[in-house]
């Protein structure tokens, strides 16, 4: 099947558009127009968007567009994934784990049926894979070796969606991913909250007293630090790219002095034993993921929605109080506020006749609030915010994850 390009129809749209579909597209156009109005003051940020990105082999012409038909990489093989009988939410890779996508693999791929292709960072057995399965139960999960690759997989039509962790209830925000949300032009179309159940894994026959190091993702290490100390594991901690990757590394290198912090599913895939189960410091350990797509969804008011924005001001953080008051005045609850350094202007120099020259850090502010962009109060709040800011961008307006969860219902499968 011909690879999708900028002129290709919407993925899976093999039938002529119905009247309902035309109405939906019209609504999406109106929503995109609204976003364009709210993000009109983004001249400085557009300059940053033009910064060079790491070259992608295979002759990709455009990164953020879809004109990449010439970027085919010989030998690329995206194999349909066999579903697990024990857990239908995640694919089965026990006998033949998929190789994660790398920068050199970013070329258009053929469609495989009607299932969504969802990119995630990590290898089979990663928590991001479980989040992809929870968000899209019938998806074809595509492992990627970097978060950047997951973004580009969607931009280049290799994947239809990406699932990205942004914060954890114990470890806090994943700052790298907030930076990527700003650098790329994907839209947040949903969120999913996943309880995290960590296990201590090692090769069969290995005992805890023989361990000399524990490896995992930095968040995994941070989330289990106190428990490891209580277990007497005062050994070296080493960070790797992801939790399941740590398990794979131990298995592939036959490391009998090393343990990994990962899921029970990773132990099953890579043939490891569980030395300790449930080693997270807090049983209510939850990671929040966002779902990303090339196009925004049409916001609604018939269910709880959340909206994510990012803004900055050329005169520093003094505008923050005014921005927050725009939401407080309209009784809009904020669920998150996060500051990140402004990479375009990291330092602001201020000359004052009384105190001399001072240097201040410049920040971008990420805010999540509980309201839909279809609501007048949200539109009015952002119109007021735009008056106070030099840069404002709506990252997405999307349904909140209202799925109940229990600390005992882990993602260990």
From Swiss-Prot:
Tissue specificity of this protein: Expressed in roots, leaves, stems, flowers and siliques.
Keywords: Amino-acid biosynthesis, Aromatic amino acid biosynthesis, Chloroplast, Lyase, Phenylalanine biosynthesis, Plastid, Transit peptide
Top-level division of the source organism's lineage: Eukaryota
ACT domain ranges (all copies): 308-399
GO biological process: L-phenylalanine biosynthetic process
Principal localisation: plastid
Residues covered by the Prephenate dehydratase domain: 117-294
GO CC, alphabetical: chloroplast; chloroplast stroma
Entry EC no(s): 4.2.1.51, 4.2.1.91
MF (Gene Ontology): arogenate dehydratase activity; prephenate dehydratase activity
InterPro entries: ACT-like_dom_sf, ACT_dom, Preph_deHydtase, Preph_deHydtase_CS
Stretch forming the transit peptide: 1-44
Catalytic reaction annotation: L-arogenate + H(+) = L-phenylalanine + CO2 + H2O; prephenate + H(+) = 3-phenylpyruvate + CO2 + H2O
Function of the molecule: Converts the prephenate produced from the shikimate-chorismate pathway into phenylalanine. Dehydratase that uses arogenate and prephenate as substrates. Utilzes more efficiently arogenate than prephenate.
Annotated PANTHER family: PREPHENATE DEHYDRATASE P PROTEIN, PREPHENATE DEHYDRATASE-RELATED
Protein known as: Arogenate dehydratase/prephenate dehydratase 6, chloroplastic
Organism: Arabidopsis thaliana
Gene: ADT6
């Amino acid at each position: 099947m011909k690879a999708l390009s900028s002129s290709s129809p919407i993925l899976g749209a093999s039938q002529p558009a119905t009247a309902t579909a035309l109405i939906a597209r019209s609504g999406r156009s109106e929503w995109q127009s609204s976003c364009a109005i709210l993000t009109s003051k983004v001249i400085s940020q557009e300059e940053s968007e033009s910064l060079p990105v790491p070259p992608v082999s295979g002759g990709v012409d455009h990164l953020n567009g879809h004109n990449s038909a010439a970027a085919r990489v010989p030998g690329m093989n995206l194999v349909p994934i066999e579903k697990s009988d024990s857990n239908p939410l995640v694919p089965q890779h026990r006998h033949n784990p998929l190789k994660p996508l790398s920068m050199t693999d970013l070329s258009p791929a053929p469609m495989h049926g009607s299932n969504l292709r969802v990119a995630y960072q990590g290898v089979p057995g990663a928590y991001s894979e479980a989040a992809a399965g929870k968000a899209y139960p019938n998806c074809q999960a595509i492992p990627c070796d970097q978060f950047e690759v997951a973004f580009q997989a969607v931009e280049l039509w290799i994947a239809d969606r990406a699932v990205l962790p942004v914060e954890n209830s114990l470890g806090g925000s994943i700052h790298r991913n907030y930076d990527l949300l700003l650098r790329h032009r994907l839209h947040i179309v949903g969120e999913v909250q996943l309880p995290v159940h960590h296990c201590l894994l090692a090769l069969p026959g290995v005992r805890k007293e023989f361990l000399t190091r524990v490896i995992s993702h930095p968040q995994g290490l941070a989330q289990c630090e106190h428990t490891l100390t209580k277990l007497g594991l005062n050994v070296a901690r080493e960070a790797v790219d992801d939790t399941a990757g740590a398990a794979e590394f131990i298995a592939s290198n036959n490391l009998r002095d090393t343990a990994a912090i990962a899921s029970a599913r990773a132990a099953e895939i890579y043939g490891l034993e569980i030395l300790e189960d449930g080693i997270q410091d807090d049983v209510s350990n939850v990671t929040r993921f966002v779902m990303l797509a090339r196009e925004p969804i049409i916001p609604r008011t018939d269910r709880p929605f959340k909206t994510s924005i990012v803004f900055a001001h050329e005169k520093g953080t003094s505008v923050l109080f005014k921005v927050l008051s725009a939401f407080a005045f309209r009784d809009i609850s904020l669920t998150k506020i996060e500051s990140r350094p402004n990479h375009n202007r990291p330092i602001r120099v201020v000359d004052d006749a009384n105190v001399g020259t001072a240097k201040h850090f410049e920040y971008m502010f990420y805010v999540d609030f509980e309201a839909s962009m279809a609501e007048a109060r949200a539109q009015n709040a952002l119109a007021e915010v735009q008056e106070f800011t030099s840069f404002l961008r709506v990252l997405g307006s999307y349904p909140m994850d209202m799925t109940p969860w229990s600390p005992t219902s882990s993602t260990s499968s």
